[in-house]
Amino acid sequence: MFEGAMPALITPFTKDDRIDREGLQRNIEFVEEGGVAGIVPCGTTGESATLSALEHEEVIDIAVECSKVPVIAGTGSNNTGEALQFTKHAADAGVDGVLLISPYYNKPNPAGLLTHFKKIAEAVDVPMVMYNIPSRTGQDMPLEVIVELAKVENIVGIKEASGNIGKVSQILENTIDEDFVVISGEDNLTLPILSVGGQGVISVAANIVPDRMSRMVNAALAGDYETARKIHFEIAPLIRALFLETNPIPVKKAAELAGLASGNLRLPLAPLSETNTQKVADELRKLGVIE
């Protein structure tokens, strides 16, 4: 279930700033046709930080209702009580797993991190993937904390976006006796992470090129690194373009250009600049995504 390419879904909005239910369903169908192994609603790319609690639940409900692949729902928060509430709802909705970001802004000490994740894991019987992304949280989860949490039965993995391949290797080295997976949280480092034992990626680019991202990951997992490298270099310029500004600003514009459901960004995020829009469009044309 936690192997392969899984898009961190964008959340499309209608013109009156509501969840675009039909658009989200179309986007899910598109990535499924591209061969993705699962979908991840309500993550950073899904603008979860600016969704209301009811909208958060609505997006997860839509994903579960229409998806033909496993759903791993983002249920994290910097408020343990809120994260627990989101996780309980997701489990009741029938998700296959949840993704829990390390609490942001608060910068908890190691004891706080351990208690946060353990409390949620003990309260809700659902497979949980932790999410380490220091650029968003202001804190890199300590290796010792990750290794300790890997021993918890239903904490089954971590999405790693620290940018530190050495740390990824250490996590894998120190959890080799656990049933624990490491999933890339950075498109540009997915292939290196797979090469040291990672099992997949929760991907921004897979919203736009799900077929290529899926083929790259599947090739690497099968040991065909020649094919994987070829695809990696093919899509690398697009990946760079998708991070010219804060995620998900560029990918929502890319989705719009590609004819997918997108809609406005929620403030305080503002639209992609004209210069960067042209750069994104250029990379989409090179890949044949648009004419």
UniProtKB/Swiss-Prot annotation:
SMART domains tied to this protein: DHDPS
Subcellular location: Cytoplasm
Keyword terms: Amino-acid biosynthesis, Cytoplasm, Diaminopimelate biosynthesis, Lyase, Lysine biosynthesis, Schiff base
Site entry: Part of a proton relay during catalysis: 44, 105
Enzyme Commission (EC) number: 4.3.3.7
An individual GO BP term: lysine biosynthetic process via diaminopimelate
Annotated positions binding pyruvate: 45, 202
Main location: cytoplasm
InterPro entries assigned to the protein according to its UniProt record, in alphabetical order: Aldolase_TIM, DapA, DapA-like, Schiff_base-form_aldolases_AS, Schiff_base-form_aldolases_CS
Pathway the protein contributes to: Amino-acid biosynthesis; L-lysine biosynthesis via DAP pathway; (S)-tetrahydrodipicolinate from L-aspartate: step 3/4
Active site feature: 131, 159
CDD domains in UniProt: DHDPS
GO cellular component: cytoplasm
GO molecular function: 2-dehydro-3-deoxy-phosphogluconate aldolase activity; 4-hydroxy-tetrahydrodipicolinate synthase activity
Chemical reaction(s) catalysed: L-aspartate 4-semialdehyde + pyruvate = (2S,4S)-4-hydroxy-2,3,4,5-tetrahydrodipicolinate + H2O + H(+)
Quaternary data: Homotetramer; dimer of dimers.
Family: Belongs to the DapA family.
Function text: Catalyzes the condensation of (S)-aspartate-beta-semialdehyde [(S)-ASA] and pyruvate to 4-hydroxy-tetrahydrodipicolinate (HTPA).
Protein name in the entry: 4-hydroxy-tetrahydrodipicolinate synthase
Organism in which the protein naturally occurs: Methanosarcina barkeri (strain Fusaro / DSM 804)
